[in-house]
Amino acid sequence: MRVIIVSGRSGSGKSTALNVLEDNGFFCIDNLPAVLLPELAERALLHTELLEPQVAVSIDARNLPSQLKRFPELLAEVRTRYILCDLLYLDADDKTLLKRFSETRRRHPLTNENRSLAEAIRDEGRLLTPIKDLADLKIDTTHLNLYQLRDTLKLRLLNKPEPGTAFLIESFGFKKGMPVDADLVFDVRCLPNPYWKPDLRDFSGLDQPVADYLAVQPDVEEMYQDILTYLQKWLPRFAASNRAYVTIAIGCTGGHHRSVYLADRLGQALKQSLKNVQVRHRDLC
């Protein structure tokens, strides 16, 4: 049996996550009181004919603060029952969350006459710290639209064919911000940039003309070999420490050429020795 716990600040995409999971066969429960988590797990094990073998629940700041403080012990109790349990935490920066609430005109669950929206967003983050600190997977949705978030959730949560650590090699552009959920970040902005070649500018790092150009650049090849050697040595150590998810981010200026080329090439190479290797290009439209 598999249980996915979805948490995060309001406006970060929890409802979207539950919808994606429900569309893919999960029995979903929104706003579950945290104290009921062990009971739900026990009932699911005893009555498999009543519940799907895959269950997703959201637990967030709508819980009582006293229940949120107990979350670590409640999660540990569930995991002692030998249930595969993943904890997903979604978040975005304060400015983005403020904008989303302004656009949807929805009321934040913690706002009242004495607490502004900005204060509610900050307070919610503090309340959810016991959950965030235990998250197996953190996804920053600041730069993701609805469709990108759905694709990311499918990639990270549903495209995991074998047990063990899921590795994500992600390209990105620094001009749109560094991914805050990355475990390892490699800056490749020092490499020759195809953007300054007029005949290559409109291509991406996945296109053959750009790949051919970068493949013959000595610095690019040296950077690739150095990163690959590092990852081949240390990623198995991450897996041995029982990490559920590891994100490796490769960044260039715009996230279209150098980082895309290297992320794709690294992903293909790592798939030869590691299971569950995925590649994603964050800023490639």
UniProtKB/Swiss-Prot annotation:
Belongs to the RapZ-like family. InterPro entries: P-loop_NTPase (IPR027417), RapZ-like (IPR005337), RapZ-like_N (IPR053930), RapZ_C (IPR053931). Pfam families: PapZ_C, RapZ-like_N. ATP binds at residues 8-15. It comes from the Bacteria. This is Nucleotide-binding protein Avin_12760. One of its GO terms (molecular function) is GTP binding. Keywords: ATP-binding, GTP-binding, Nucleotide-binding. GTP binds at residues 60-63. Signal peptide: none annotated. Displays ATPase and GTPase activities. SUPFAM superfamilies: P-loop containing nucleoside triphosphate hydrolases.
